Amino acid sequence: MFPMLQLLDLSDNALEGLVTENHFVNLKELVFFLASGNRLTLKVSPDWLPPFHLIDRLGLGSWHLGPQFPVWLQSLKEISEVDISNAGIKDEIPTWFWNFSSQISVIDLSHNQFSGPLPQISSSDITHLDLSNNFFSGDLIRFLCPPQNESRSMMKSLHLRRNGLSGQIPDCLSGSNWPNLRVLDMAENSLSGRIPKSIGLLNSLSFFDLDGNKLFGNIPPSIQNCTSLWKLDLGENEFEGNIASWLGSSLSSLVVLRLRSNKFHGELSPDFCHLTSLRILDLANNNFIGTIPKCINNLTSMVEQSKILIREIDLERVKLYEESAVVTTKGQEYQYFAIIFVLITSFDLSNNNFLGEIPMELTTLGELRSLNLSGNKLTGNIPKEIGNMKQLESIDLSRNHLSGEIPYSLSNLNFLSYLNLSYNNLSGKIPTGTQLQSFNASCYVGNNLCGPPLLGCSNDDDVPDEEEDRGDDFEAKWFYISMAIGFIVGWCGILGPLFAVKSWRYTFFSVYR
């Protein structure tokens, strides 16, 4: 059946069951077999040779192929892309795998149980390599600083996330070894030490992830040479120092800046506001001080709809659509992939030592979907203009020293699904007749607020000024309308009989003369 079939795409159908070599007998002309995203089990004999020896792309991600490494791959000499991720393989990667095909360029071995040191790669044609979510251990020296016979000149994307790698990042990264590298993901390992200065030689770098390690020290100034950076994630480490002023001027292409849970300190420089492409900002859990810069309205990608073109960095060929960013919002962490996170906007300065008032300029960020300023020392009122931030889905202003009433404009946020104003000095009645009553009472505790969902106010007239103003305006309008109606009715009561009763009319006009 289908002896001339060249392309078979069964991807992401959640298919289950057993697949044997008999299913492939007639598929000798197959060039593209894409079936990742299913839960199928492949059961073949140890000496099986696939009939589709001319295959170019093979996608078996999430199939059960293990626990042994599938040796039948060795016969596919023309293959250029192979995905055997999440395949239950607990074996070692055989040495032949790195040069069994002269065409191999894209390899995904992620989410298996490979262990030991990182492999020695002899092929110089690999563009995308994903070894993430395995049990590789040891240091990075041999892998990142290859000898001349192991060139990495074609590599564009390297994923080593969530392994057991340790030691320092070697100071041997260079444009000659990695001239085309755009993605370097070494997050969630046990790496220590400082970021080497040579990182600045990776001029093509677009995504740089080191979150969840044990790295320390300052951000090296050399990183300002990586002017193509879209994403910089140094979260959950022990970095310290100020955010250098050059960050805003040199890395103006940044879309994601995530520095949460470190030891950064000092004030945010006005140069920070030059990050006009920024969509996701996370500086939470540090020691920043000072006021929130008023120039944040210059973060234009948060002000208006993003004009970022994903094709600018060639997502398809570099597989950058698989890159992701973690956003903490609505009290939880969410992971967004690159194709999505350019549409997400988040502003998180929580758990620092920012003080002063929330700048009115913040309310001009009309594209913002998540705002978290909790755990600071902010004072003053919540800006009345907050209702202009129509896209907001999550607001957390808890654990500050904010005072005054909840602005009525907050009820204009139709997409708001998470709100936390607890433990401030807010007072007055929670605006009624809006979704603000649908939030749990815990969102308002630790203040001097009243009204649903809290206890009722002692004085029903104790309503927010804005509601009072609206009520006063309403009453004033009816007062004047009533006067006009009364005036008209009164005159009709006097003049009506004059025109209706002839004797009265005669008497009135006689007196008038």
Listing of model-derived features with the role each one plays in the protein:
Residues L454-R513:
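Terminal membrane/secretory targeting segments in land-plant proteins
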